[in-house]
């Protein structure tokens, strides 16, 4: 833990409802300030790439803060809820990751305003949509200014090997599935012989002896 990061004491006392603040609320404000100072310190430029990085950094921090939830605990005899104390808890890493992934999938392509470099790097007003018919990105939207390289084909300039010859999963609908990984080029199917250790037994002391078994496995590879 960071010694200077204490509980968030603004959540204290009577809430005015049928519960009261108590416990130790996660200090999201401290985390926001610390993260901003630590992550943004490397962004010194004034060009579009640096403005994009600063915007996306802030979008991530705002996503974390906006997903804080109230947790409560009951106090009382025999399991009754005579008194209920509550505190604010940060979302889990999985929750944040899923939200960021959703925003990544819906990221907005932007360009710099016509008047040049932004006067305020911390706001989304630095950008305009690349497509004029699209709406202005919000503060928690992720943005980008150029398309990713084509990862389907080999590109020595970017160091991407492409997906030709990659083993894929014929039954998966995810990124490891043949439909996506092979970029609609199709795949081959072959039966290969595999030698594996099997029927392993432990012998005192201290060895494990195994037999060698042969099996056949179906392998799918991208065209």
UniProtKB/Swiss-Prot annotation:
Cystine residue pairs: 7-24, 72-86, 74-81, 152-183, 168-178, 182-222, 198-213, 200-210, 205-206
Stored InterPro entries? Wnt, Wnt_C, Wnt_CS
Coiled coil region boundaries? none
Tell me what PTMs the record reports for this protein: Palmitoleoylation is required for efficient binding to frizzled receptors. Palmitoleoylation is necessary for proper trafficking to cell surface. Depalmitoleoylated by NOTUM, leading to inhibit Wnt signaling pathway.
Give one GO biological process term: canonical Wnt signaling pathway
Keywords, comma-separated and alphabetical: Developmental protein, Disulfide bond, Extracellular matrix, Glycoprotein, Lipoprotein, Secreted, Wnt signaling pathway
Compositional bias (Polar residues) spans? 125-135
Q: Where is this region: Disordered?
A: 110-135
Q: What is its main location?
A: secreted
Glycosites:
169
Q: What does the UniProt entry say about where the protein is found?
A: Secreted, Extracellular space, Extracellular matrix; Secreted
Task: Give any GO molecular function from the UniProt entry.
Answer: cytokine activity
Which Pfam families has this protein been placed in? wnt (PF00110)
Q: Which GO terms describe its cellular component?
A: extracellular space
- UniProt-listed PROSITE patterns: WNT1
Q: Note the lipidated residues of kind O-palmitoleoyl serine.
A: 78
Q: What does this protein do?
A: Ligand for members of the frizzled family of seven transmembrane receptors. Probable developmental protein.
Q: Which family does it belong to?
A: Belongs to the Wnt family.
> What is the protein named?
Protein Wnt-1
Q: Which gene encodes it?
A: WNT-1
